[in-house]
């Protein structure tokens, strides 16, 4: 027993001595860390909570949160994870992701192919970046030749990654260009994901209408591990400016064409990304349930109303449901199992007259009305990732003479309303209630090749209305 204790003490002493000299057992598991988009990658702390195969969907969802102003940025980030800093759109409105369609085989020697046919003629490439995983290569190949010198963190190791781009045709392959990435990292630090700007290569391929390209990733001094040829796959992000996005029905032409998607056959996001999306949707539903018909408020101009039928025949307050009085709420707390019907509002005659006068003056005037669009209602929910619905609003109401300043009439609309009121010229309609200011909407969706795309569509939400 005494001998065993002595051996244990000797082992612990040797272990502590190694730690004091800067040596430690190899307990490191290569994590995943995204570096800033550049030609030189520096080391950083590993992030084992991020899985390599999540990178494309997580990267695109992070960009969606970034450019849409979503509050879900923190929800999608796992503890300790670090995502790349945003690349400016530079006047663009589109971000396309392309995942490697096929990993390397013994015949192609590690060639990763990309199908870029989703790029349209109207999309001008602003920048393009190739992201590829080299964690195993760096962690395996960078060994310390002199253990005593490796204790100094200032010593850096260098490794060069070569990239060769190929245009793939049916009968032959044509070299598109050569690139290299110089990896610089301190000893014992981890570099897992690298990035390389490939803007000029993709512009050249698009100009020549060559949309099937391949990348061969090699190292001059070390052979790539076989696992790196298959998993995780590299991916490409393309920032573009779609010149046709402001044309009439552009949102329909770019989204409605994906009707070949069928339920259950489309691509799926990773589980933690889907959970983050569902949490955000539950928050939106919980904050929007108290509409005027449920909280005993008179409907205002922000909410929907119908134009059908004569104005005098409408009785919008007849079936409004009120909140139960205080006594009723106390009774409901005492009898949780009992079912109580909502009470109907009982207005006196003076209140009803005041409400009718308010309804006659305000809702008839030009104003913004509430409209919520659910993509499931129009059959687009299969390929739209986020948002599943949005507040579009619409403009409706009269622009009668005299028009108040609150309706913001144009000079032409003012003259037109005067001519119509005087009746000098017959058949002149009153000015129209139209959107004055509108805002854009970011939509994250799958394209026809099941790649994740982010587009910022202009003029999707009405901010204010005016008479024109």
Curated annotation (Swiss-Prot):
Residues 29-53, 314-349 are annotated as: Disordered. GO terms for molecular function: BMP receptor binding; cytokine activity; growth factor activity. InterPro entries: BMP3/BMP3B (IPR017197), Cystine-knot_cytokine (IPR029034), TGF-b_C (IPR001839), TGF-b_propeptide (IPR001111), TGF-beta-rel (IPR015615), TGFb_CS (IPR017948). Residues 340-349 have a biased composition (Polar residues). The keyword Cytoplasm does not apply. SUPFAM superfamilies: Cystine-knot cytokines (SSF57501). Homodimer; disulfide-linked. This is Bone morphogenetic protein 3. The lineage of its organism: Eukaryota, Metazoa, Chordata, Craniata, Vertebrata.
